[in-house]
Amino acid sequence: MRSVDSLLLLGLTGLASQANAHPAKRQPNDSPLSKRGVDLDAFRLPELAKYVPQDEVPDISNARIAPSSDYTKTAEEFVKSVVGKATFRLVSDHYVGTNGVAHVRFKQTVNDIDVDNADFNVNIGADGKVFSYGNSFYTGKIPGPLVKRDTSDPVTALKSTVEVLDLPVDASDAKAEPKGDEHYTFTDTSGTVKKPEAKLVYLIDGEQNLKLTWRVETDVLDNWLLTYVDADKTEKVVGVVDYVADLATYEVYPWGVNDPSKGSRSVVEDPWNIATSEFTWISDGSANYTTTRGNNAIAQVNPSGGTAYLNNYRPSSSSLEFEYTFSTTQTDPVSYRDASITQLFYTANKYHDLLHLLGFNEAAGNFEVNNNGQGGAGNDFVILNSQDGSGTNNANFATPADGSPGRMRMYLWTYSTPRRDSSFDAGVVIHEYTHGLSNRLTGGPANAGCLSGTESGGMGEGWSDFMATAVHLGARDTRSTNHVIGDWVYNNANGIRAYPYSTSLTTNPYTYRSVNSLSGVHAVGTYWATALYEVLWNLIDKHGKNDADTPTFDSNGVPTDGKYLAMKLVIDGMALQPCNPNMVQARDAILDADVALTGGDNQCELWTGFAKRGLGTGARYSSTSRTESFALPSGVC
């Protein structure tokens, strides 16, 4: 599955409901679907997962499982012990993380058909025992075997999808060509990036009922959708997942300079880390390039906003000198497109290398063409579109499953004269790329649709803001320093969020209960990033802050400073948590990540940070009435 996340749908929705919110700001561009009156939030999948952290896994559970040198076998036996007679299959994206924890995922099946939102993830510790697990398997009544043609025609499901979601797709003459067992590709359609597909799957709906559905995949560029259409009543859409999430020598704003208002451009030489980009940034191991293309990314302008990218304009330099002039006073984007593409290529590659060091490597599902035998599925660099003409005042990232390229689209912003190019705002670029990180890790690389709920989707936005903020902490920053997102592109010192990221409850009053009155994933994400900001500074106060571009590690693979340790624990937590987690579960996964990595050395700092913002030991999740808690577990500090 795939996810699409946008930067500027970001979080301005829901601000009016906050009595103490800042004055309303101009609303950045909505998605094309919302412009056509389609509310995708109404079709979000239910959040079903349960997460059992390491300190709650019963000892008897491990005692009942025969020891095995194959961690997948251990995980499989554990699932059998928990789910009884439920049928399931092993997903092929299992791997061992850099913290020594193996991640194994299973998909529930009914009548040999996948239950698309029923997942079981088992985390196996370095000792070979079950460390923690997540479970969203269906436990209700199982329907009988299907009778041939018990279901509607897949073409009807495609047409219903187009009609209900008002998609810009012509399916009037669509024909279904078999691709596999109850899996079809549609021909004679137009309006999509690639041919639409439909597959018969079960889905657990919001009423906890098991529905047989056609999963219809349509990539219309602005939205890359998995639409679940009732296979009995094909006019009814049961749920929707959107893969798109809205944000040599190179003359660039160097790493650490967030945008043109924060510093100056300079020429950097061979900026790649050969340990994480072994072919450099301008080769994929098979071909060497003299342009902004390589193993991790391909960058170009896309003024038409179309789907083609391979033959779009990008700068070329036989001498490998990507040095181009740029001034913020230039009014014509064409006049500085070389500088824009180069900056986007540089920032995305630098972030790729950093994430690789922190654990988002080939086996974990990162974005590379040639994985060089390191695991995972290749052929999936990130397509980086600068000056994308499909919109303004936004940015987005589409995350398909491992093995298909990610797609980032960076727009021009019109809140200033001249317009501002978001490719020069590293915070926006990092925000967008982080959607690829969180969607690939949560639920496993083969399932990029595990942040499709309101709270889990909100955390997706929060992780993106958090990582961008952590990267750009300044050398003189302290826990009293506040940070905002998008202030340069938005031409507003307050940025694009309701509040700055701050450890002050006066400056930013959000606590877990605040989420009850927030609407939209970007507003929810602001709270989550606020909680993580508290954790970040607690760890920095304990371990110090490394202001270098890359972390240093001790002999056990633990970052030696608080900033990179916080980022590492957040990333490791993503891999531990279940599909579509809530914030209490994600908190527990980060706490577990610390146990796995450091033996629990930072439990006090983590709990104190979360509890300050209402995610203490008594916090409870409910989609309509979250209960906050400021209490710490007994003896944790």
From Swiss-Prot:
| Pfam families referenced in this protein's UniProt entry, alphabetically | FTP, Peptidase_M36
How many cofactor units bind, and how?
Binds 1 zinc ion per subunit.
Where it sits in the cell: the answer is: Secreted
Q: Give the record's GO biological process terms.
A: proteolysis
Instruction: State the active site.
Output: 432
Q: What is its main location?
A: secreted
**Keywords for this protein:** Glycoprotein, Hydrolase, Metal-binding, Metalloprotease, Protease, Secreted, Signal, Virulence, Zinc, Zymogen
Instruction: Give me the glycosylation sites of this protein.
Output: 288
Q: Which residues does the record annotate as propeptide?
A: 22-246
Q: Name a single GO cellular component.
A: extracellular region
Q: Which residues form the signal peptide?
A: 1-21
Per UniProt, what is one GO molecular function of this protein?
Answer: zinc ion binding
Q: What is its EC number?
A: 3.4.24.-
State the needed cofactors, names only: Zn(2+)
Q: Which residues of this UniProt protein bind Zn(2+)?
A: 431, 435
Q: What does this protein do?
A: Secreted metalloproteinase that probably acts as a virulence factor. Cleaves Z.mays Endochitinase A (CHIA) between residues 'Gly-29' and 'Cys-30'.
- Please report which protein family the annotation says this sequence is part of: Belongs to the peptidase M36 family.
* UniProt protein name: Extracellular metalloproteinase MEP
Species for this entry: Fusarium vanettenii (strain ATCC MYA-4622 / CBS 123669 / FGSC 9596 / NRRL 45880 / 77-13-4) (Fusarium solani subsp. pisi)
Q: What is the lineage of its organism?
A: Eukaryota, Fungi, Dikarya, Ascomycota, Pezizomycotina
